[in-house]
A protein has these predicted regions:
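Charged alpha-helical initiation segments
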Residues: 1-30, 35, 41-45
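Short amphipathic alpha-helical segments and their helix-coil junctions
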Residues: 2-18, 145-146, 151, 186-193
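Phosphate-binding glycine-rich loops and adjacent basic patches that engage nucleotide phosphates
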Residues: 18, 171-177, 199-207
Length: 224
């Protein structure tokens, strides 16, 4: 009863997952892409097929049967997502925030930066009050030609990696369903606890990882 094309994409995804999580994400995206286009084509109320709406339809379908059907299947994969994946998301969120803070045109930022912040508001709070603010202290992004130079000097490159890794570690815990404590960068060193809802966990994976990875693979090293 399962569409042949979707199954082949998923089998390909499982096969390459241990060695090439980037390709696994791409094959997984193709399965999702195929499923939501079939769904949109069968809905007469939808006049034009678009990726964002399609992914939202997939997310809504998963959430509708999350506890009864899908959680037991998908939860193990959420718990085993590799750290490299979270470094990828943390990196484009921090770079996007630095560019936005510096007034760099939106076209230079990854589109997933804006969409993920919009779908998971706590990420904006964490960036503004903690990781993004700290990252801005070492970054001075400027447009050079048709690219953005983040302006991080050699003395601060290790600090940049440390900030990205720490942020990625927090993101991984949030996706696992844990509550995390974030220390703000204010003088009082305010601490606040955050957690993701089930909808935010799925939004992070579908939009922040799979869709963002798809854009990166198709468009290369450009804002997409």
């Amino acid at each position: 009863s399962y569409p042949y094309e979707i199954l082949t994409y998923l089998f390909d995804s499982y096969y390459v997952l241990p060695q090439r999580p980037d390709l696994a994400a791409l094959f997984c995206w193709q399965a999702i892409n195929h499923s939501y286009y079939v769904q949109q084509l069968g809905d007469n109320s939808i006049g034009f097929c678009v990726d964002t709406k399609g992914v939202e339809l997939v997310r809504e379908a998963l959430l509708a049967e999350w506890n009864n059907r899908y959680k037991a299947i998908l939860e193990p994969f959420l718990l085993k997502l590799p750290m490299k994946t979270f470094h990828y998301v943390a990196s484009y969120l921090l770079k996007g925030y630095a560019m936005e803070s510096a007034g760099i045109a939106e076209k230079y930022r990854a589109s997933s930066y804006k969409s993920l912040k919009g779908k998971i508001p706590v990420l904006s709070d964490i960036l503004i009050n903690s990781y993004g603010n700290v990252y801005n202290q070492i970054a001075n992004p400027v447009v050079v030609g048709n690219k953005v130079d983040l302006g991080i000097d050699n003395l601060n490159k290790e600090k940049s990696r440390a900030i990205t890794h720490s942020f990625a570690t927090k993101l991984r815990k949030l996706v696992k369903g844990d509550e995390v404590e974030i220390t703000f960068s204010d003088i009082a060193r305010t601490k606040k606890r955050y957690s993701f809802t089930e909808e935010e966990r799925l939004s992070f994976v579908l939009f922040g990882i799979l869709y963002a990875s798809r854009c990166n693979n198709f468009h290369g090293n450009v804002a997409a």
